[in-house]
Amino acid sequence: MDHSITILSEKEKAILESYMLSADGLAEFWGENCEVIIHDLTQLDASVVKIVNGHLSGRQVGAPISEVTLNFVNKMMATPGMNHVTYFAKNKRGEAFKASISAILGEKHQIIGLFCINYYLNTPLLSFMQTFTPITKTESENISETFVENTEELMLNALEDAKKTVYSNLTISSSNKNKEIISLLYQKGIFNLKDSVITI
């Protein structure tokens, strides 16, 4: 059966574009030993439309789909409900990596692209640990994230945090404290939540 597609709709192009943005974030999270690739299946001879940390495999944008990946694509297209696969492999330099291939679906739920992740298993432990350990003083070190069960709890927590920030700042006059609290909540996007004005 011929499962090939020849052209993407504008909506499907936007879908692929959104995955390209996700590729950057995922690669940054896992570090330089994680390769992330987006394939456009309308052009198998130049299917790689996005690649982050391509130095790991030596590939770049415009590279063709690999034989192994193409084989998995055919299996996914022929098997209902199969939309991802994870496996272990080696590159041409003999370096082992764990790979994941996930289908990117189009408007008619057909596979239009692939979201692929390759994590190299020869990554030194120190390098791996440094990826998840702040080395320099950054803004992210000071972020405290609280997970909540509902948006009301989220809003109330945000309100308490804003109050603490404002009340501890002695340069803010008493008459401006409420204004500053509202300003902080606005900057955090709290007022985009339903019923935020009533709750706050």
Regions of interest found by a model, annotated:
Residues 34, 162-166, 170, 185-193:
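Short leucine-rich amphipathic alpha-helical surface patches
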Residues 176-200:
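Phosphate-/nucleic-acid-contacting segments
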Residues 2-16, 29, 113-114, 119-176:
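Juxtadomain coupling helices with adjacent low-complexity linkers
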Residues 16-24:
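Short amphipathic alpha-helical segments
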Residues 38, 101, 196-197:
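Short loop/turn and capping residues at structural boundaries
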Residues 23-85, 90-92:
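Structured interaction and signal-relay segments at domain junctions
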Residues 62, 117, 189-190:
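Glycine-centered flexibility motif
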Residues 68, 72-134:
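Sensory/regulatory domains in signal-transduction proteins
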